[in-house]
Amino acid sequence: MSRQPILDIKGLRTVFRTRAREIVTVNDVDIVVNPGETVALVGESGSGKSVTSLSIMRLLARKVGFIDAGSIILRGKSGQTVDLAAIDEEAMRRIRGNDIGMVFQEPMTSLNPVYTIGDQIGEPLRVHRGTSRREALEAAVELLDRVGIPDARRRAGQYPHELSGGMRQRATIAMALICNPTLLIADEPTTALDVTIQAQILDLMQKLQSESGMGMLFVTHNLGVVAEIAQRVVVMYAGRIVESGPVKEVFRNPRHPYTMGLLRSMPRLGDATEMKRRGEKLNTIPGMVPGLANLPSGCAFAPRCSFAVEACHAAVPPLASVNEHHGSRCIRWQEIAA
């Protein structure tokens, strides 16, 4: 299998317009996704994760959000590369649902309530390949069966409200994969599901990925999910990448205080009883994510950081190389240990 990247983002900068000013929501973001690889994009709400994924798909609100700088190079099914940041909307329509599939957080809002499940899953085939409605429906039924929906033919004739939350999410996964994309973007696809269904959906996505060899950008705030599904992790804070590297290395040896704070605030099995016995509380990160319209000077995390020194407030730190595969946007990364 070719190791040329499926997705290669360099220097992505996304801006939102307000009546008063322009606000940078994603700043200088670099992400690479290889064939068969899952890269997790993590951070608190407001960190820029979802705006990054919407920028890749060019689904930003018109006249409000726009890509101001950078490139988004996609290697499609033909093997040819295209810069998604530079093409027009007509060209982008030929790529969405064909070379790139996307699974959204809440399936009830991403599925159309007035069309049957089968029609919605089959629509990308009709749009991109000119498949007949009957052939598209047969393909949809087959894929519904593959994603684990029982009695797939009957379910294909039903409407979204007639399916459970887990079934709806399986249907949106089927819709995203119907054209065999090279890249799947999954934006918090398991957040609205209970833990049992969440585990089933994660297993399903890994199985389908191993069968197709597609790359996956998995957007989440759940580090437990990251440990299970991803090979590399990109941590975002206030619109910038603050740490990136192999999941095992970053989790074992985080080199940014924000990553360390996220990991330490994760509850672990057995912790509650032991912490109660000791009279301890769950670790938290003090403060809140700053508003992107009013970022502090220097490192945006400095006001919440126990490692911060005067120099942290002077300038935005560069993304330093911890090693060939691991980067940290912290001037004190060498002093930080988990």
From Swiss-Prot:
Record domain ABC transporter: where: 10-263
One of the Pfam families matching this protein, by short name: ABC_tran
SUPFAM superfamilies reported for this sequence: P-loop containing nucleoside triphosphate hydrolases
EC nos: 7.4.2.-
Enzyme class label: translocase
GO biological process: peptide transport; protein transport
Topology relative to the membrane: Peripheral membrane protein
GO cellular component: plasma membrane
Annotated CDD domains: ABC_NikE_OppD_transporters
Sample GO molecular function, one term: ATP binding
This protein's UniProt keywords: ATP-binding, Cell inner membrane, Cell membrane, Membrane, Nucleotide-binding, Peptide transport, Protein transport, Translocase, Transport
Sites where the protein binds ATP: G43, E44, S45, G46, S47, G48, K49, S50
Database matches in PANTHER family: ATPASE AAA-TYPE CORE DOMAIN-CONTAINING PROTEIN, OLIGOPEPTIDE TRANSPORT ATP-BINDING PROTEIN APPD
Function: Probably part of an ABC transporter complex that could be involved in peptide import. Probably responsible for energy coupling to the transport system.
Subunit text: The complex is composed of two ATP-binding proteins (BRA0404 and BRA0405), two transmembrane proteins (BRA0407 and BRA0408) and a solute-binding protein (BRA0409).
UniProt record similarity statement: Belongs to the ABC transporter superfamily.
Protein name, as recorded: Putative peptide import ATP-binding protein BRA0405/BS1330_II0402
Organism for this UniProt entry: Brucella suis biovar 1 (strain 1330)
Highest classification ranks of the organism: Bacteria, Pseudomonadati, Pseudomonadota, Alphaproteobacteria, Hyphomicrobiales
